[in-house]
Regions:
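Short coil/turn segments at secondary-structure boundaries
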Residues: 91-97, 172-175, 189-193, 321-324
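Glycine-/proline-rich flexible loop or hinge segments
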Residues: 2-9, 54-67, 115-118
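Positively charged, Gly/Ser-enriched RNA/tRNA-binding surfaces
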Residues: 11-29, 40-41, 75-87, 94-145, ...
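Auxiliary tRNA-acceptor-end handling modules of aminoacyl-tRNA synthetases
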Residues: 1-12, 188-191, 200
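Polyanion/phosphate-binding surface patch
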Residues: 38-68, 108
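Acidic, His- and aromatic-enriched active-site or binding-groove loops in soluble protein domains
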Residues: 56-64, 165-197, 342-344
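Short, conserved phosphate-binding/catalytic loop or strand-edge motifs used
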Residues: 111-115, 151-159
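A short beta-strand-loop structural module common to alpha/beta enzyme folds
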Residues: 32-38
Length: 465
């Protein structure tokens, strides 16, 4: 296991012990253990994860010529196994996992240990609350205090941007780049440059028509265009319906003339950054913001439902922050997202987090869309936050014994070691038949407390170090 700088055997034991305890915590809540492959085809992670993750993956070409990657996260692998039929049972399904993930992060090890859980087939606010509460309570159960949870909602922000007239494509772009706005004018300039490069700021030749269609209900626009076209579309449809063709045309049409809406959307996102705070306080500010931008109040219904459901759990000792400008680094999230933070962890290195990813199962080959929600914790970071009085061992550590003998008595030494192991002791055999001084030196280096020297007659002499 490749741990953080200055790692030690003690750190490894902590990570292993935490892993066992948290896994039992999840299992008591109905989450079954499932293992995934450490190596997957690269396109599994690229379909919906976004470029930010792609730039941090460890990828290579295998002997068959296929592009493969060390897993940078577990969720896509879990979903792949569900789509392929390996995860069986009625919905909703609850799964937990743990193991190494691999991501490039300057100044840190490229490998770290994760444990997490996925809830497949449940799309309610109660499902969101179960995952967020379980992530928080799992830390509390091993004695970690002082963490807070930052909560956002990709679906709500996306709908707010659509209310401003922004196309879906431009909205997705802006959602992914909200963190850049936190860096000030330099970040804003970079966003504009990228938007222009992707053709999001062009006025287009149909900007007047685009504006008119944006102001009309979708059903009326469809009828209007059908009236213009008449029967001229028959015979040229291929496998697509007229509704599908018109919908795609409208999507392209609404991408024109985005420059006038892009500036308004930028200002909205900048204001969202300043509204983060305790849920009740931030929610009141969001109502005022929505009114200022003529956004209907019911756009926030999913947030209200989530906090109502979260209220069923004991979260009074964990500060919550409602921050609609928060964005996780993976692009497949569609609803609630959250990060678990602690002031003792450096900026940019959260303890863990997760979110809702309702479109991922269909994107990875599922026959239909399925709601899903999950999270993961960084076990090394969790280990760094354990209280000083954390009880590492659930059971008393057995005594360590070095069993040594002359070469002619090796059979007796092996038999003695096997008897000790059967009784629960740690018994290591001296394969080099060391003399007393060398054996004592070796035992000290290995933190072994007792040496048992076995004679040919089977008699044992003990030496305590």
């Amino acid at each position: 296991m490749n741990l953080l700088p200055n790692s030690s055997q003690q750190q490894q034991r902590l990570v292993s012990d935490i892993n066992i305890r948290l896994r039992k915590f999840f299992e008591r809540r109905g989450y079954e253990l499932f293992s995934t492959s450490m190596l997957e085809r690269t396109d599994l992670y690229l379909k919906k994860s976004g470029g930010e993750l792609a730039s941090r993956m460890y990828s290579f070409t295998d002997p068959s010529g296929a592009e493969v990657s060390m897993r940078p996260e577990f969720t896509s692998s879990v979903v792949k196994n569900y789509v392929s039929g390996l995860l069986k049972g009625p919905l909703p399904q609850r799964w937990t996992y743990s193991g190494s993930v691999f991501r490039y992060e300057p100044g840190f090890s490229g490998e770290f240990q994760q444990i997490g859980a996925e809830l497949l087939g449940a799309g309610s606010s109660d499902a969101d609350a179960e995952i967020v509460a379980m992530a928080s309570q799992s830390l509390s159960t091993i004695g970690i205090r002082g963490h807070k949870i930052r909560i956002g909602h990709m679906g709500v922000v996306s709908e707010m941007l659509e209310c401003l007239g922004l196309s879906k494509r431009a909205g997705v772009f802006l959602l992914r780049n909200i963190p850049q706005l936190r860096t000030g004018e330099a970040g804003l300039a970079q966003i504009r440059e990228s938007a222009s490069r992707f053709g999001l700021l062009s006025s287009g030749n149909n900007s007047d028509l685009a504006r008119i269609t944006r102001e009309m209900p979708q059903q009326d626009v469809m009828q209007m265009i059908k009236g213009f076209i008449g029967d001229g579309m028959h015979g040229a449809l291929g496998q697509r319906t007229s509704e599908e063709i018109i919908s795609r045309y409208l999507e392209k049409l609404r991408e024109e003339g985005q420059a006038e809406f892009f500036d308004i959307a930028i200002e909205l996102c900048k204001e969202l950054i300043g509204l983060a705070g305790p849920p009740l306080v931030a929610r009141k500010k969001l109502t005022k913001l929505a009114k200022a931008y003529s956004i209907p109040e019911n756009v926030f219904d999913p947030i209200d439902s989530f906090f109502d459901s979260l209220g069923h759990y004991d979260m009074k000792n964990v500060p919550l922050i409602l921050d609609l400008a928060s964005a996780r680094g993976i692009a497949y999230y569609t609803g609630i997202i959250f990060d678990i933070e602690n002031p003792r962890i450096k900026i940019g290195r959260s303890i863990g987090g997760g979110g809702r990813y309702d479109g991922l199962i269909e994107a990875l080959g599922g026959k239909k869309s399925l709601p899903a929600m999950g999270f993961a914790l960084n076990l090394e970071q969790v280990a760094n936050l354990l209280p000083k009085d954390y009880d590492l061992d659930l059971e008393e550590t057995p005594a360590k014994i070095l069993v040594t003998a002359q070469e002619t008595a090796m059979s007796e030494a092996v038999a003695t070691a096997e008897r000790l192991r059967a009784q629960g002791f740690f018994a290591e055999i001296d394969l080099e038949c060391k003399d007393d001084a060398s054996a004592a030196k070796y035992a000290k280096q290995r933190d072994i407390q007792t040496i048992m020297r076995v004679g040919q007659d089977g008699q044992v002499n003990e030496q305590f170090i």
